[in-house]
Structure formats: C-alpha cells, structure tokens
Amino acid sequence: MKLNRALMLATLAVSASFAHAADPKATIADLDARLGKIGAPRVEGTDTVAGKAVPAIFFGERKINNNFDVVDGIRKSHQATATVFVKDGEEFVRVSTNVLTPEGKRGVGTQLARNAAYEAVSKGQQYCGPIDVLGTAFDACYNPIKDAGGKIIGVSYIGHKK
C-alpha cells in the first residue's frame, strides 16, 4: 500500500512539473522576472546584431543584445524558446534568442512578424496564444518591455513547441 501511494505521489509530482513546464504564462513570467532581477530596462546607443545596427537594450547595466544567458536559462528550465526584441522604428528585432533558424543558427537580427502578437504588444498589451515563429508552430506569450517612462522599447517572448 505504501509503495502504491509513493508511486502515485511521484507520478503526480512529475505530472505537475510537466504541466508547469508547458504553461506559457508561467514561463513568460519567469523570463520577465529574470530580466527584472538584472535591473530596469532601457535603450541606450546602438549595437550590431547579425550585421545590422539596432538600438541597444539594457536591463540594469547588462546589455542584452548578443547576450544569451537569460534566454538559454529559460530553455534549460522550461524547455521553451525565448527571445528579447528591441524596438527599432516600427519593427521589433530579435537581439537575444534561443530560437534557431532552419540553418541551425540563432535567429538574431530577424523581426517579429506582423501578426496578432505584433498588434497586441504595439498597443502595450500581452499576447498569449498560437503563433508561427520562423516557420514553427508554438503556444506563445509576448509582453511589451517598457522603460521607466512607460515607452515601449522592446518585447519579451517565450514559446512552447506544439
């Protein structure tokens, strides 16, 4: 009887961890919390990402452009893709990502597609739902990143592959 109870509890614990791991809202909350622990978001100057000059986005003193530790931590903890975009004019450009192109390289320098997520974050709103990311279907969440003055300066993203 004790073995059955222990087995049942272990199964429930594993099931709960898988349910949590595939919860896009919990995963985006974790990404945003990790970024927030580094410091307040801001844009300062420019940086080259995939051969293109784009605004440099910082959290605290850490420049996020071409820095992959936070997004790779999300992959490790949640088995999810993660990206930080910076706003460049009317576009949002991937400056830190674990999303891979079909060639197997990080998709930095690519833009957020003009889709439902783009429409929501452009208005300062979260988007969670199905989305195509560089040709792959995901259950995703996107949050606008705002500076101290409330201006949208970027977007955080996570996705769980369907």
PLM region descriptions:
Residues 57-63, 136-162:
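Conserved beta-strands of PAS-like sensory domains
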Residues 1-8:
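Bacterial N-terminal signal peptides that target proteins for export
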Residues 22-64, 99-105:
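Extracellular/periplasmic ligand-binding regions of membrane signal-transduction receptors
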Residues 17-21:
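Sec/Tat signal peptide C-region and signal peptidase I cleavage site
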Residues 25-27, 32-45, 71-92, 130:
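Short N-terminal helix-loop-first-beta-strand/juxtamembrane motif that initiates sensory/input modules
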Residues 65-79, 96-135:
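Extracytoplasmic/periplasmic sensor domains and loops in membrane signaling proteins
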Residues 84-86, 99, 145:
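Hydrophobic beta-strand positions
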Residues 9-15:
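Bacterial N-terminal signal peptides
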